[in-house]
């Protein structure tokens, strides 16, 4: 019996793409910062001249899937991370955006076999979002760690 697990120390040669929603950028910029910190601490070159990392900004979380899909299909990335923050308002818009973003990101991973980390905060208030993006903890760091684990795991699995 084989057992497969991703490792966090296997970042050499890993190409990472990050798609960040600009809407609620007070939150998403902090998520990106935490994510980059994690990747850097685990050996990914996050410099402006990096050949290991690309970051794409989109208007909002609804647009995350289409850009993630394009990045996955181009064959240059072993793992993708989507970052966004959708905060509940007084209309059903929240439910529509969250449902479509989550389904879309999941479909990209299924259709392309490229792991796509769903790093979209879904909160009731801005305060809750800020707490998850740096005041109490930074989930961006966790999303970076998940990407490292999944990138490593996918490299370890037998290919079709």
UniProtKB/Swiss-Prot annotation:
Gene3D superfamilies: Lumazine/riboflavin synthase. Pathway: Cofactor biosynthesis; riboflavin biosynthesis; riboflavin from 2-hydroxy-3-oxobutyl phosphate and 5-amino-6-(D-ribitylamino)uracil: step 1/2. It comes from the Bacteria. The keyword Transferase applies. The keyword Cytoplasm does not apply. 5-amino-6-(D-ribitylamino)uracil binds at residues 23, 61-63, 85-87, 118. InterPro entries: LS, LS/RS, LS/RS_sf. Keywords: Riboflavin biosynthesis, Transferase. The active site is at 93 (proton donor). GO terms for biological process: riboflavin biosynthetic process. Belongs to the DMRL synthase family. Catalyzes the formation of 6,7-dimethyl-8-ribityllumazine by condensation of 5-amino-6-(D-ribitylamino)uracil with 3,4-dihydroxy-2-butanone 4-phosphate. This is the penultimate step in the biosynthesis of riboflavin. This is 6,7-dimethyl-8-ribityllumazine synthase. It comes from Synechococcus sp. (strain CC9605).
């Amino acid at each position: 019996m084989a057992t497969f697990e991703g490792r966090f120390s296997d970042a050499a040669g890993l190409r990472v793409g990050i798609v960040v929603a600009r809407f609620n950028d007070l939150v998403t910029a902090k998520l990106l910062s935490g994510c980059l910190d994690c990747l850097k601490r685990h050996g990914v070159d996050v410099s402006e001249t990096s050949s290991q990392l690309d970051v794409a900004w989109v208007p909002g979380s609804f647009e995350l899937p289409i850009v993630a899909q394009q990045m996955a299909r181009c064959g240059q990335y072993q793992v993708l991370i989507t970052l966004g923050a959708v905060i509940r308002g007084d209309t059903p818009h929240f439910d529509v955006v969250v449902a479509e973003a989550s389904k879309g990101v999941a479909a990209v991973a299924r259709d392309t076999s490229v792991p796509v980390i769903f790093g979209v905060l879904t909160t009731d208030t801005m305060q809750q979002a800020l707490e998850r993006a740096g005041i109490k903890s930074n989930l961006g760091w966790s999303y970076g760690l998940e990407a490292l684990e999944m990138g490593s795991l996918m490299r370890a699995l037998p290919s079709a």
